[in-house]
Amino acid sequence: MADYAAIKDGIKTRLETLSGLIAVFDTVPDRAVPPVAVVVPGAPPVEYNVSMEASTNASQLQRFNFEILVLAQRFYAETAQDKLDSYVSGTGSVYNAIAGDTTLGGTASDARITRVADYGQIVVGEGEFMGARLDLEVYAV
């Protein structure tokens, strides 16, 4: 059976390849000093008995849904959007970091960023940040 904690560690490892981030968290921190990335459970966090075409383990396949929060700067900073743009597209993007190893270090069968769900003001705890929320699907048996 897939190991949820190991998958989160694999995601964190891939995000740590992005230049410019001060830190990557696989749990929601009490305090974040941007630029950072945070891995949080998506909705629903886990789906069991998912099928993929040509899968021999269709009854065991699980889909793990995550949100990757990229917090570029405090919301009011003028340069925050330019920093954020590089994380949502281009060679230094979150998409390319995950695509660089879709097995997340061997913990998953496949992983893919499916969309940028939000771009703009992101509230984490009591702080407002210019950020983006990216949806990540991870498939594992």
Name every feature range the model reports, one short phrase each.
Residues 1-33, 43-141:
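Charged, amphipathic alpha-helical segments and their flanking helix caps
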Residues 35-39:
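A short glycine-rich, His/Asp/Glu-containing loop-to-beta-strand
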